[in-house]
């Protein structure tokens, strides 16, 4: 059965609310609950809709592939089969919707990247934050990213626009580690021609690769994110 989640977007975006795990559960129990939630999410046909019924994201039932299968098919995920590759060392699941215009980052490069995203708290079964609303269109989240021999480090920029939704909501410049996983495989550029599009991915990020609130409260999130190089 298709699972439909309706969302009411407020003027300043949507916040699902920070959750507390101070309920007597051990860390091991919280991790088990997280694993169960991810497993259930993979097998549900989730559709996230706006309050007016317009479809925002159709996640669908997910087919996972191994890293070996992912690399064997030129680091792509088959969209018709709704494939997500699971990275065993981090537990992050990734679907590359579009590899995007431009080129992959190179060693020593620094880039300022605009990110537009929706964050879905899998454990709470609700959208927690998004900057895909009218208010945040002119104030997107901006990452300052450095590539050092294939290892990416990043922080949210606050000097350009005072910080986007992620920074304003969580109060931290730290970029979730899960957000950096796609940078090895996607291009970072800008749309120049009509037939070009910027990079877009979908992620399932466990608490260990998430922001500080996810880490401290042990919950996984689903993300849909676009990555676009900012003009100098």
Give each language-model segment a name.
Residues 1-21:
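Sec-dependent bacterial lipoprotein signal peptides
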Residues 21-232:
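Cross-family detector of peptidyl-prolyl cis-trans isomerase
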């Amino acid at each position: 059965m298709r699972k439909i989640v309706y969302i009411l977007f407020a003027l300043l975006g949507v916040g699902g609310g920070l959750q507390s795990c101070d309920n007597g559960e051990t860390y091991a129990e919280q991790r088990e609950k997280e694993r169960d939630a991810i497993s259930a999410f993979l097998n549900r046909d989730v559709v996230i809709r706006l309050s007016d019924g317009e479809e925002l994201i159709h996640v669908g039932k997910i087919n996972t592939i191994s890293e070996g299968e992912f690399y064997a098919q030129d680091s792509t995920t088959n969209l018709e089969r709704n494939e997500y590759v699971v990275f065993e060392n981090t537990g992050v699941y990734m679907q590359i919707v579009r590899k995007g215009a431009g080129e992959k980052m190179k060693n020593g490069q620094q880039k300022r990247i605009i990110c537009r995203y929706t964050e879905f708290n899998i454990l709470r079964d609700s959208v927690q934050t998004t900057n895909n609303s009218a208010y945040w269109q002119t104030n997107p989240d901006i990452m300052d990213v450095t590539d050092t021999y294939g290892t990416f480090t990043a922080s949210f920029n606050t000097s350009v626009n005072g910080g986007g939704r992620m920074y304003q909501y969580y109060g931290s410049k730290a970029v979730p580690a899960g957000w950096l996983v796609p940078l090895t495989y996607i291009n970072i550029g800008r749309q120049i021609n009509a037939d070009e599009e910027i990079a877009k991915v979908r992620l399932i990020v466990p608490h260990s690769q998430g922001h500080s609130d996810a880490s401290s409260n042990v919950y996984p999130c689903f993300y849909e994110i676009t990555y676009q190089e900012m003009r100098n």
